[in-house]
């Protein structure tokens, strides 16, 4: 990973962004699509809070060198601000999704996570005064329909509604957290901000995680999943996500959550052999079209 980190700055437009943003959103969706599979594997052995602690700590370990380079910028006031945002944007939603992963298939968490887009736009509109254009509303609606098609046929089984409610609550947290990152952490190196967020979250959760840590040994497959969940799906992904928030804004960056269920289905097909259907193909087309439309700027902007 390069140590040349671009500071968070105001969003900018240019010809390169036409390709850069969709590619980065797709990469991030692919990474986060795998996170629910890893949680499904690891959560039964770790338990929700210990798994989240491992995820936060491992992600922080990957990013700490970036924070060390920028440590002079991180005052005590900034650390308090980051701790509050970390609770809303990491600790609580991670714990809710991990709790749900113990009770339902991985796809349920990935599908409910797609509601982050809706909540992010609503928070931005009602609390931060950001406009929602008709073009983006159409794109959001198309993506939402695609997610609904993916969800069809996946809503039965023990614990599904519990997992769905937990995922919805987590998405509300993300909606606020994403906007708070954009509002209060602009101007700092993105990788350093991501590292500080994960460190603060790990410190906040440590007492509860230690108290609930499993007494029995955790098997190797669960540890492998936890390492990938922390280092790749949290550490590396947070850097990319914070850079997107800085460049294109919180609501547009949050549309990546429409891609997560799509990639969750693809990874399930590749890794555990779940079948692909025509409805999934239709859903994928709607999701991709919706995300693309929501990213387009109005003429003259």
Which residues does each PLM region occupy?
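Glycine-/small-residue-enriched transmembrane alpha-helix faces in small-molecule transporters
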Residues: 2-50, 99, 156-183, 301
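Helix-helix packing/entry segments at the starts of transmembrane helices
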Residues: 52-54, 90, 94, 108-115, ...
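Transmembrane alpha-helical segments that form core, pore/gating elements
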Residues: 60-63, 120-122, 126, 157-212, ...
């Amino acid at each position: 990973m390069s140590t040349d980190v671009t500071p968070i700055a105001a969003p900018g437009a240019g010809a390169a962004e036409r390709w850069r943003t969709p590619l980065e959103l797709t990469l991030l969706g692919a990474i986060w699509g795998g996170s629910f599979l890893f949680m499904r594997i690891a959560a039964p052995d770790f338990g929700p809070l210990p798994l989240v602690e491992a995820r936060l700590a491992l992600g922080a370990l990957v990013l700490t060198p970036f924070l060390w380079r920028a440590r002079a910028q991180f005052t005590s006031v900034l650390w308090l601000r980051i701790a509050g945002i970390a609770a809303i944007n990491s600790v609580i939603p991670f714990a809710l999704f991990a709790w749900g992963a113990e009770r339902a298939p991985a796809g349920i968490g990935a599908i409910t996570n797609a509601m982050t887009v809706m909540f992010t736009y609503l928070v931005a509109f009602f609390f931060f005064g950001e406009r929602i254009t008709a073009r983006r509303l159409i794109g959001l609606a198309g993506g939402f329909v695609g997610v609904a098609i993916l969800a069809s046929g996946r809503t039965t089984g023990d614990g599904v509604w519990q997992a769905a409610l937990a995922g919805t609550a987590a998405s509300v947290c993300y909606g606020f957290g994403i906007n708070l990152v954009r509002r209060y952490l602009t101007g700092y190196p993105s990788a350093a901000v991501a590292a500080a967020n994960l460190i603060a979250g790990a410190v906040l959760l440590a007492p509860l995680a230690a108290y609930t840590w499993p007494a029995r040994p955790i098997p190797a497959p669960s540890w492998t999943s936890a390492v990938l969940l922390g280092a790749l799906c949290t550490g590396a992904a947070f850097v990319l996500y914070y850079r997107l928030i800085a460049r294109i804004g919180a609501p547009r960056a949050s549309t990546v959550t429409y891609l997560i269920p799509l990639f969750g289905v693809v990874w399930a097909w590749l890794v555990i052999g779940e079948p692909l259907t025509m409805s999934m193909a239709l859903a994928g087309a709607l999701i991709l079209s919706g995300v693309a439309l929501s990213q387009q700027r109005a003429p003259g902007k």
